[in-house]
């Protein structure tokens, strides 16, 4: 069996699992079920002797989160492709296919989202082996999930004949149904949930684009050929990329192709499309209550109660069918049956221009992360975490001075011409306008508290003189 290259799609806005999932830090990077994040689990289940190193397709904002989370689980990516902007799944999958085809014209790809869970990894890998067999014959293979209940939130796959595990020809894609039709399809054995997972030879999906979407093939090919290597990331060319159609792989290719097969499988799959799904997939007590470490439930039934901040204790009393998720800057309380309306709430917050709609409390950067602890008109306090060996840019500020207090590790601090080491419980003052840099010279993470004073504290008040991450003026961090 030839090694298969995993293609992991890592985009999305994450609004359905707000406030824990947001545009700046969507659900795939969050440990919603277990200790690993959804992205880490997605990468882990596509490892082993039958798989090559994964190719990740993501955007510029997530690139360092991707590398950090892969490092945490010891997985080396074969490549990380950076989309200049989101154009849905068709251009993303095509870019990865062309990238792999240039390396190996016989490449076989398995394409998977980064934000799903699959509990039975062995069953999933057996399904991949079944798909591999028919992909060698030129089939484009999709994976169908055996429904466990009538579901209106998923698209469906109609089979040409009933099958339990063997690949069979696909008869039709079915749009998300109403409840009446969902019940009918659940009772039939000919319909499966559309998982959004695919397996095919790179040459076959490229040929499909050549036949059904040649303009996208031309644009993505140019974008890849005109890409640049940016700190090891393959940054696709924007000018060519925006010429692609913003369209899913289902609409662009799959619904038009005549060489489609489906492999059915049951492996504890969920796309975690709402807080009700998160509740279902986590272990609950005898009353159906799932709580985090900082949450207490008294006389509650069928409820999810989570605190995502060590300083916030959440107590639920007499709750039934309720979702409660508390974070430092936002709290969600919702009826379990209305979990899909969370997205509407996020839209309202956006209209109100509330930063909580899209911005995660922790702001991730190539060197680590920071979070704002408090902010006022004349000051802001941040907690800053710097990875071992990492450094911030050499920079200055026009509107603020800074005071750094190291609370863990050692900081190498440059202020104008002076370089000094600041140890735990020591501090240093950065005058307004001073050219400065912070670096972690140690082998362990370094953390400090930063107190800013001045008249403006925006992340665009940064003038860079030197930056190892090649960020321009006004770029964040």
Predicted features by range, described:
Residues 1-8, 15-19, 23, 31-113, ...:
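Conserved N-terminal catalytic core of the sugar/cofactor nucleotidyltransferase
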Residues 448:
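Noncatalytic nucleic-acid binding interfaces
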Residues 9, 112, 406, 451:
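Catalytic metal- and UDP-sugar-binding loop of GT-A-like glycosyltransferases, i.e.
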Residues 29, 39, 96, 115, ...:
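Residue-level signal for inorganic ion chemistry
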Residues 109, 190, 197-198, 270, ...:
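A residue-level structural signature of the nucleotidyltransferase/glycosyltransferase Rossmann-like core
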Residues 117-118, 428:
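A short, conserved beta-strand element in the Rossmann-like catalytic core
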Residues 2-3, 203-405, 410-429, 436, ...:
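Left-handed beta-helix
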Residues 120-243, 261:
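Conserved core of the sugar-phosphate nucleotidyltransferase
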């Amino acid at each position: 069996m030839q090694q298969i290259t995993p293609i992991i799609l890592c985009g999305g806005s994450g609004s359905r699992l707000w406030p824990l999932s947001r545009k700046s830090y969507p659900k795939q990077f969050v440990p919603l079920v277990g200790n690993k994040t959804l992205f880490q689990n997605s990468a882990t289940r596509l490892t082993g002797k039958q798989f090559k190193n994964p190719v990740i397709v993501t955007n510029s904002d997530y690139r360092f989160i991707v590398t950090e989370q892969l490092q945490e689980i010891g997985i080396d990516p074969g490549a990380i492709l950076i989309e200049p902007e989101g154009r849905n799944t068709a251009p993303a999958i095509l870019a990865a296919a062309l990238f792999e085809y240039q390396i190996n014209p016989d490449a076989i790809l398995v394409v998977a989202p980064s934000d799903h869970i699959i509990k039975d990894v062995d069953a999933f890998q057996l399904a991949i082996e079944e798909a591999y067999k028919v992909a060698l014959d030129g089939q484009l293979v999709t994976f169908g999930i055996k429904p466990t209940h009538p579901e209106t939130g998923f698209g469906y796959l109609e089979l040409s004949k009933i099958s339990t595990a063997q690949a069979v020809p696909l008869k039709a894609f079915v749009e998300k149904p109403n409840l009446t039709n969902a019940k009918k399809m659940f009772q039939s054995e000919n319909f499966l949930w559309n998982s959004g997972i695919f397996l095919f030879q790179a040459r076959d999906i490229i040929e499909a684009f050549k036949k059904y979407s040649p303009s996208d093939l031309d644009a993505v090919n140019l974008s890849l050929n005109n890409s640049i290597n940016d700190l090891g990331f393959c940054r696709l060319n924007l000018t060519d990329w925006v010429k692609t159609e913003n369209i899913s792989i289902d609409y662009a290719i799959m619904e038009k192709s005549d060489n489609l097969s489906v492999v059915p499988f049951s492996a504890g799959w969920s796309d975690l499309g709402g807080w009700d799904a998160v509740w279902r997939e986590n272990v609950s007590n005898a009353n159906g209550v799932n709580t985090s470490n900082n949450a207490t439930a008294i006389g509650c039934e069928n409820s999810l109660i989570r605190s995502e901040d060590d300083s916030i204790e959440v107590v639920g009393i007499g709750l039934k069918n309720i979702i409660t998720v508390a974070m430092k800057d936002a709290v969600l309380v919702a009826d379990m049956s209305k979990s899909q309306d969370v997205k509407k709430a996020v839209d309202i917050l956006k209209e109100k221009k509330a930063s909580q709609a899209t911005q995660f409390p922790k702001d991730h950067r190539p060197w680590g992360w920071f979070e704002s602890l408090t902010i006022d008109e004349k000051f802001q306090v941040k907690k800053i975490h710097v990875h071992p060996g990492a450094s911030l840019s050499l920079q200055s500020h026009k509107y603020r001075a800074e005071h750094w207090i190291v609370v863990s590790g050692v900081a190498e601090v440059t202020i104008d011409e002076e370089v000094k080491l600041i140890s735990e419980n020591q501090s240093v003052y950065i005058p307004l306008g001073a050219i400065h840099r912070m670096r972690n010279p140690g082998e362990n993470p370094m953390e400090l508290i930063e107190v800013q004073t001045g008249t403006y504290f925006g992340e665009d008040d940064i003038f860079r003189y030197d930056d190892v991450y090649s960020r321009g003026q006004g770029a964040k961090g």
